[in-house]
Amino acid sequence: MKIKMLFLSFASLVLPSCSSVQTVGGAGMIMNYGSTMEGRSADIRTITFPSGKRMIYGLTVTGGRKPNWRHAVGTTEGMSGDTRGIPEWLDFEWREPSYPGLKMKDFPSDEAYSKAVSEKYSKLTTKTQRVFIKSRIPPEVVHEAIESRLHVQKGQGLPEKSLWIYFIWTDDGIKFRWDLYCTKPCVTKEGGDEVD
């Protein structure tokens, strides 16, 4: 829980302009990218919003099979970290290089290393997938997140309930999960795809 709280504190401060929908009183959300792929990473190139806004990414989610997707190494960030709305869907574009990848120490020079990396990436297939979000989260869960956010006094800090969104790269593509995270004891609410 301490780790998640640290992520939450950090994520609420970053990427304040990611969402293409400025909805007053929106739920906002925190995004986590993870991977259960073994021997491959997910090199995220772009994320496109329903509005057509396209974000260029340089984010790589490392591979490695874990007993549970929640234990997979991931990256957490704020997506609509303030009061913005939840997008209907997001289009992801990524490549899957081998993991671990090339190491600079194995090459005679930086130039040789850069050339090898460029050649390796040029041969990779670019994959795409649309992940639906808003329709898969129960309205009452979104309402709880909104209500919790509205009750936060200025300068008080984080709301008691926050919506977390998970994108997990698997051998079968991107899986989607969500949960309503509580800073105090509450009934666990979560849903989405089954992830082996």
What are these regions (language model features)?
Residues 1-7:
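Bacterial N-terminal signal peptides that target proteins for export
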Residues 39-44, 100-103, 174-176:
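Short, surface-exposed beta-strand/loop "edge" segments at domain boundaries and coil↔beta transitions
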Residues 22-53:
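Short, surface-exposed binding/anchoring microloops in extracellular/periplasmic proteins
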Residues 119-196:
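Compositionally biased low-complexity segments at domain edges in trafficked proteins
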Residues 79-143:
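Mature extracytoplasmic domains of secretory-pathway proteins
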Residues 47-99:
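Tryptophan-paired
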Residues 16-17:
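C-terminal motif of bacterial Sec signal peptides marking the signal peptidase cleavage site
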